Amino acid sequence: MTYRLHRKTVFPGLIILLLCLTLNAQTGKQEVPLRPVSTDRPFRLKVKEEVGQRCDLQMTRVRGNSKIEKPPLIDVNVLYYAEAVFGNPAKTYGLLVDIEGERKLIWVDADGDRDFAEETSYELFKSDRYPGLNVYYSPMPLRFDVTYLIAGEEYTMPVYFDLPYLIVARAGYHDFLLLKTRTWLAGNLYLEDEEIPIALVDMDFNGCFDDPQDLFLMDMDYDLNFSSSEAVKIRNAAKLRFKRRTYGEIDFGSVPKKIIVTH
């Protein structure tokens, strides 16, 4: 049996097919891998010095303490103890501080398992920026292995935090230390044969990079630097104009591993 197609049937079908092919060519979904960078932030942020994750310090016994499964390998009974909260879902990480010894030290429970025996210690130094106060700081950033739940699977990434000051022995005040996220995320978006560097910055110091107040940056002038004018808060970054007449949607559901861009 022979079928005959009329022009009225063929031409509209061809037009629809061409339109579909054109739209598919113009629309693409791209997975952008992210990598942690632990140098200074991508641009100088105007963040107040006292802003960060504030962790209260309390003197505590290190033996027989449910929060300390194994204490550091030093001969002391009492140390300062603090807790920081990072990751998604939030997880508690302990810190122990000794400012009574010849060397002032802080131990970080990097993986949150309450075992300080094998953990790295960082030396603290007294700051002269606050006369009359016992203020210490760490010149080395503190490392935490922060965990995230992505699509039902656990993902762990090292995140570094600066310790700009630790204040103790203030009459009538709580002792505390302050942590500021040093690590940021970098990646490269490919759009119309061009490579656009991108970055994500943790602005609330919880080791996450996809909170509404965190920042998403694109180096749109290709000067290999990020500026504050190239930053937008995550809550405003679901839909962006990448280039003139080119718009896209960004899915931050897999941060810090990757973002998914549809354009």
Map each language-model feature to its residues.
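Bacterial N-terminal signal peptides that target proteins for export
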Residues: 2-13
